[in-house]
C-alpha cells in the first residue's frame, strides 16, 4: 500500500472515533466497551487466523527473535528514561514513573497491527503479532515493576490479569499449533468464515477506540514531557531495534516490521498502569496524545523509507 494511504486510513478511522465523541454519538467511556470487543473477540480471531495462514513451523524460531528484541528495546529505553529523569531532571517518583512508562512502552498492538497490515499486508501483520508479544511481556514485567517501584499502589498488581490476556493466550496457542503442523483446513468452513467476520472488525474498532480515547485537552498539562517521550519512542527505540537486528541477523520483512513496531507511540496501557499505581496521570495523558499525533508523521516516514 502507498505510504500516504496508510497514514490517511489510520487518520480517517481515528477521526471517526474522535468526531463520534464530539457529536455525542459515542462517549469517551464507550472506548472501554470497544476495547473489550477487540481484546476478547476480534483481536484473538485476527491473531489466530493470521499466524495460522502466514507462519510455518520452520519460521517460528526466527520470528521469536522479534518479541525478544522488542522486550530488550523497552528495557533499554526504560533504563535511559530513568537515568534522564532521576539524575538530569531530578523528578519525584510519581512523575519519574510516568516518564519511564510513556518512554518505554509502545502501542505495538492497538496501533501497530493496523499500520503493519496497511504497510506490509497479512505477512507483515503476522510479524507484528510476534513483536506485540514482546510488548505484552514488557507491560507485564517492566511496566508492573515501574508501577510498584515508583507508585503508591504498591499492593496492586496486574500480572494475573495480563497472564489471562486473550491476545497473549491466543498468540502462544497459535504458535504451538503451527509448530505441530496445524492447518486451517482442519476447521469447518462455517467456523472459519465466522472467525473472518470477527477478525475484520479488529482494525476499525481499534482505530475508533483510539479516537475516542484521545483528548486534545491533555495538552494543557504541558508538551515538554510528550516531546521527551517522542524522542525515546521515535528515535532511541528504533535505533536500539536496528542495532539489535544487526547483531542477531534479523533481515528482510522481519526487520522492516520490527523497526516500524519499535517506533509506535506511547501505549494506552500506560494510562491504566499510571492510574492503578497512582503515577503522574497528567504527564502520561499529554505524552500519549503528543506521541500518537507525531506518530502519523513517523508512519509516513517509515513508509517512504521502507516501501520506496
Swiss-Prot record:
GO (cellular component) term, any one: plasma membrane
Alphabetical keyword list: Cell membrane, Membrane, Transmembrane, Transmembrane helix, Transport
Record localization: Cell membrane
A Pfam family per the record: Mem_trans
One example of a Gene Ontology biological process annotation: transmembrane transport
Keyword rRNA-binding assigned: no
Main subcellular location of this protein, as a coarse class: membrane
Xref: InterPro entries: Auxin_eff_plant (IPR014024), Mem_transp_PIN-like (IPR004776), Na+/solute_symporter_sf (IPR038770)
Gene3D superfamilies in alphabetical order: 1.20.1530.20
Keyword field contains Membrane: yes
Transmembrane segments: 6-26, 31-51, 63-83, 100-120, 128-148, 162-182, 195-215, 221-241, 257-277, 287-307
Bilayer topology term: Multi-pass membrane protein
Family, as annotated: Belongs to the auxin efflux carrier (TC 2.A.69) family.
Protein's recorded name: Uncharacterized transporter MJ1031
Protein species of origin: Methanocaldococcus jannaschii (strain ATCC 43067 / DSM 2661 / JAL-1 / JCM 10045 / NBRC 100440) (Methanococcus jannaschii)
Organism taxonomic ancestry: Archaea, Methanobacteriati, Methanobacteriota, Methanomada group, Methanococci
